[in-house]
Amino acid sequence: MQTLKVDLGERSYPIHIGEGLLDQPELLAPHIAGRQVAIISNETVAPLYLERLNRSLAAYSVISVILPDGEAHKNWETLQLIFDGLLTARHDRRTTVIALGGGVIGDMAGFAAACYQRGVDFIQVPTTLLSQVDSSVGGKTGINHPLGKNMVGAFYQPQAVLIDTATLNTLPPRELSAGLAEVIKYGLICDEPFLTWLEEHVDALRNLDQVALTEAISRSCAAKALVVNADERESGVRATLNLGHTFGHAIETHMGYGVWLHGEAVAAGTVMALDMSQRLGWISAQERDRGIRLFQRAGLPVIPPEEMTEADFLEHMAIDKKVIDGRLRLVLLRHMGEAVVTDDYPKEILQATLGADYRALAQLKG
């Protein structure tokens, strides 16, 4: 087992990474203050792992709230089911909410914990690659709004993150690839040597090699922890973690939440960010193509929805958390391994990126 730390002073917390951690109650006990525990999971994950987690929590009074699965249910109506469960069981301020599932479950359980009686403890137990390397770390919680993704939420840090890498053995290949989009992101924005490592190990990752997966998860979490330590509330450098997300969120919102997985939209959105970075002269065409090749090898889409027009993108991108005083800030690559957040770009460059022939780019060889 490896343990990393998110260093936020009194609100610091560990990230435990390893196989079989669901069966180690001693990792959970130090982070549960009271006797009441509420496990929040979904209809897909609960049949696989809820019983094991319950066994590790045998010393506590535990309830479970099982939600419908999928991004389409990340909304107010589903959030109310969590509050219904907590209130019906008369859980008090010393309850601990545990999120058992992927990013949707973690975001909603964390937001519910932030709101319930003005804040109760929660623990992240992520079961998808995407949630293990990204959404479970850093305290972003929330739900979607019909007009924009993740527009209603709170920064609320967990007490601990417990990453059992064995849960990836039941993850569908499409979901695994979606998680790899966020892994690749770290190489692009802050760790070019990691990008090289990913090029060498992407096949092993897709084949669920536990050694490779543990390394990828550990390096991703370490990268994110460093950024969160420096900028918890995304006033500066943390925004670079959103490479590809402005374009990607536009895809998710326009196509309907859940039609494209988050990681799939991020991959296509990152290709658009690579294209724009190249048009600005910050990276070369060869470097742009290097990123595209890696996304393709990871089994991810590199062509945005062809039915989306420039106007569609701009409409959705105008409702983005990085918009300040009406100006759209984008995360782009100044160099491979170095991202910047900027609103200083010619409008014509953005228009060219939105109208680019991504099908032609997807045909590149090498």
From Swiss-Prot:
Q: Which NCBIfam families match?
A: aroB (TIGR01357)
GO BP terms in the entry? amino acid biosynthetic process; aromatic amino acid family biosynthetic process; chorismate biosynthetic process
Single GO molecular function: nucleotide binding
Q: Where in the cell is it found?
A: Cytoplasm
| Assigned EC number | 4.2.3.4
The protein depicted here goes by the name 3-dehydroquinate synthase
Provide the residue positions that the database annotates as binding NAD(+).
69-74, 103-107, 127-128, 140, 149, 167-170
How does the cofactor bind to this protein, according to its record?
Binds 1 divalent metal cation per subunit. Can use either Co(2+) or Zn(2+).
Q: Name any cofactors this protein relies on.
A: Co(2+); Zn(2+); NAD(+)
Q: Which organism is it from?
A: Pseudomonas fluorescens (strain SBW25)
Which family does the record claim for this protein? Answer: Belongs to the sugar phosphate cyclases superfamily. Dehydroquinate synthase family.
Query: Which key words tag this protein in UniProt?
Result: Amino-acid biosynthesis, Aromatic amino acid biosynthesis, Cobalt, Cytoplasm, Lyase, Metal-binding, NAD, Nucleotide-binding, Zinc
Q: Name one Pfam family in it.
A: DHQS_C
What domain of life does the native source organism fall in?
Bacteria
